[in-house]
A protein has these predicted regions:
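Structural motif corresponding to the early beta-alpha repeats
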Residues: 65-73, 79-88
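N-terminal beta1-alpha1-beta2 module of alpha/beta enzyme domains
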Residues: 1-74
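Hydrophobic residues within beta-strands of alpha/beta enzymes
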Residues: 32, 80, 110-112
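Flexible, glycine-rich active-site loops centered on histidine and acidic residues
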Residues: 2-15, 45, 86-153
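Acidic (Asp/Glu)-rich catalytic clusters
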Residues: 25-26, 68-77, 99, 103-110
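Glycine-rich, flexible loop/turn motifs
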Residues: 44, 55-61, 74, 80, ...
Length: 153
């Protein structure tokens, strides 16, 4: 059976995620995903893949894990997920703990979508060279897998 989900930028002016999640669950949606951008650099040369001007939502994006915790607290069965989390911009030890915690408090409903990102300047502000993003992505996924599956990682 086909399942339907929603995706939305969680911002300070969007529908609050607890209200959106509760409504989505009542209407029969399977999932709710939110994207991630830590910030948009004031001086950005990277073109937005969408073509035109970068939508203002990018400048106002809330933290996905805190936002999804709010969504999980307002629902019982709605799957919650990142679409996507920029793990090239995150510490893998801290992220592994945040992801495991959110999955636990949501009752196993978290879907973790990950990616490397497109915004070169944003990435470089986190100390990651754009040319190494795929290597860093792989390393951090493997590190998190070790943390989640080994007694000592």
């Amino acid at each position: 059976m086909v399942q339907f989900g929603l995706t939305m930028f969680a911002t300070d002016y969007s529908v609050p995620l607890d209200i959106l999640a509760g409504t989505a669950e009542k209407l029969g949606f399977e999932s709710l995903f939110v994207p991630e951008h830590t910030h948009i650099p004031a001086s950005r040369l990277s073109p937005w893949p969408g073509g035109a001007d970068l939508p203002r939502d990018y400048w106002h994006t809330l933290d996905p894990f805190v936002s999804l915790a709010l969504a999980a607290s307002a629902t019982k069965s709605l799957k919650i997920g990142t679409g996507i989390s920029l793990i090239t911009e995150r510490d893998p030890i801290l992220m592994a703990k945040q992801v495991a915690t959110l999955d636990f408090v949501s009752g196993g409903r978290l879907i973790l979508g990950v990616g490397a990102g497109w915004n070169q300047e944003e990435m470089e502000n986190h100390g990651v060279a754009f040319s190494t993003r795929w290597k860093i992505l792989r390393e951090r996924i493997l590190a998190m897998r070790e943390i989640w599956t080994q007694d000592e990682a």
